[in-house]
């Protein structure tokens, strides 16, 4: 699964997720909800996941992309879900996934863990008015929607790009 996270801040001060809190929440979820066993190696991977996402939050204008390549089954998707559930309200995220079912699952999981509606998925089976997307903290879309919007944007035909890339009045990055 390919995941892209883009984050925008509405304040000039970085508001990242504390790594120790993230690892603790991830370990608790991993063991209690998923009934998996944790290990120091997994916790190290989870720390790196959080640090990578935090780097994007704290360096929003950095042109450098960081790629996460932990092994299969190490919690990349669950880490993304936990991280987004912990995001302060002032930070918006765009997540791009391959399949509509993944988009629905990720948005639903974020909301369930956060205990509030922070995330929505938008795709051909779950259309949400474009103007409502700007107030959505975590937007989950498919690769196809992202590619189509980017293609239309490049040809000045776009109606969705700004809605995908804007959270409140700031740009998602």
Sequence positions of predicted segments:
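SF2 helicase catalytic motif II
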Residues: 145, 155-173
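Pre-P-loop entry segment of helicase/translocase ATPase cores
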Residues: 2-57
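Conserved coupling segment at the C-terminus of the helicase ATP-binding
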Residues: 18-22, 66-67, 71, 173
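Walker A/P-loop
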Residues: 62-80
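Well-ordered, non-membrane alpha-helical segments in soluble/globular domains
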Residues: 39-54, 81-82, 151-162
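Residue-level preference for the first positions of well-ordered beta-strands
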Residues: 63-67, 92-94, 137-140
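Conserved Walker A/P-loop ATP-binding site and its immediately adjacent core
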Residues: 79-112, 145
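Inter-Walker segment of RecA-like/P-loop motor cores
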Residues: 113-151
């Amino acid at each position: 699964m390919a995941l892209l996270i883009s984050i925008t801040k509405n304040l000039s001060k970085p508001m990242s997720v504390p790594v120790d809190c993230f690892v603790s929440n991830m370990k608790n979820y991993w063991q209690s909800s998923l009934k998996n066993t944790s290990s120091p190696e997994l916790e190290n991977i989870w720390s790196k996941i959080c640090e990578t996402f935090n780097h994007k939050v704290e360096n929003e204008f950095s042109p450098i992309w960081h790629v996460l390549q932990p092994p299969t089954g190490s919690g990349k998707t669950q880490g993304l879900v936990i991280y987004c559930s912990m995001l302060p309200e002032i930070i918006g995220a765009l997540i791009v996934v391959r399949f509509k079912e993944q988009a629905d699952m990720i948005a639903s999981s974020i909301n369930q863990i956060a205990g509030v509606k922070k995330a929505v998925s938008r795709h051909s089976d779950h259309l949400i008015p474009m103007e409502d997307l700007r107030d959505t903290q975590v937007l989950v879309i498919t690769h196809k929607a992202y590619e189509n919007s980017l293609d239309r944007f490049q040809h000045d035909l776009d109606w969705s790009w700004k809605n995908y890339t804007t959270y409140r009045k700031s740009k998602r990055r």
